[in-house]
């Protein structure tokens, strides 16, 4: 509304960033259902950040994109980055099960309610699965039991997008996976001021040029 009211003038640049937490990234985009584009038929950016890009386009609705460039990679979760001697199933054959921050024991057994609707899907036939049931599942070939570095993931774990608009304005979006906590930030700079904020905190600041 403040943008529509012209409080910060014409938009020069929009910067948005989504920090995907380490436990969300590993569960959904490395071990889980959106980890492999050949199976889920979508990309990481579309699966996780389509709302961020929609929001940017909505705020820039007075103009249209003319150029888009994007770069990203599967930087972190690759076999060559696994700790020395790492197994393939964390709780079955890995000596790092108690120390690796991505081990299924630390992510799912120590926090059994974390992403439970994904991780414990194979136990939905049980009315009230016990911790013993969950431990047993994490010793099988279940996708969520795998070593984080030895999955069939092929989507990026970080990506940057740069948009050039017809008006001359620019926009950037950064998706960074593996952060300590989830965060969505935005910073909009206009000819008369700027707005920046954090969506998790529902806190936004307006600065005006005096």
Where do the protein language model's features map onto the residues?
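Predominantly a Rossmann-like dinucleotide-binding segment in NAD(P)-dependent oxidoreductases
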Residues: 1-138, 144
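Glycine-enriched catalytic-core subsegment of oxygenase/oxidase enzymes
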Residues: 141-210
